[in-house]
Amino acid sequence: MLCKCAAGALRALRPATPRIGVLNLTALSASLSANRTSWSRWTHMRDSSNAAWTPKVPQTPTWEPVAESQLPPATRISPDLVDKLERLALVDFGSEEGVDCLEKAIRFADQLHVINTDGVEPMDSVLEDRELYLRDDTVTEGECAEELLQLAKHTVEEYFLAPPGNIPLPKREERSAMLKDSEF
């Protein structure tokens, strides 16, 4: 349960009009058939009979097969790169299965190389062509600091206590040395 201040702030930050026609694609995965991966990219077919109304989000997706020859060579991840990614992301995925999953995800994203972007200007923001309405920075309710602080898991005096920063994983050599010396 949020206090009145927090609930009011959340209401004020909601968009005035909800998004219309947001496309939900749940099946964005490569289909495996006979140990061969087939790739497809999403395209939009516009109905020219209704030219007056052009939605920003396509109404019906279609899939266009992408030939394996159109994709760049498959990316192979070296053990050194896996080690560096593990330390940066603080995630242990160095198993053969984890590396295989990462290589498949990169291969799926390789389809972006096929898209023709000639003459397309890069965007600074997705919303750069719209006027963004900001609410005035005025206090509508007050004296709710105590209520907000009660929602915090840890506080020191009248401040929220942030959790400690991430502790980096040791390098591969250090991890193997630690495992050799451990009792497990």
Curated annotation (Swiss-Prot):
InterPro entries referenced in this protein's UniProt entry, alphabetically: Asp/Glu-ADT_sf_sub_c (IPR036113), GatC (IPR003837)
* A GO cellular component annotation in the UniProt record: mitochondrion
Query: What general EC class does the enzyme of this chain belong to?
Result: ligase
Which GO terms fall under molecular function for this chain's record? ATP binding; glutaminyl-tRNA synthase (glutamine-hydrolyzing) activity
Which Enzyme Commission number(s) are on file for it? 6.3.5.-
Instruction: Give the residue range annotated as the organelle targeting sequence.
Output: 1-47
The record's comment on protein family reads:
Belongs to the GatC family.
Query: Which HAMAP family does this UniProt record tie to the protein?
Result: GatC
* Protein name from the UniProt record: Glutamyl-tRNA(Gln) amidotransferase subunit C, mitochondrial
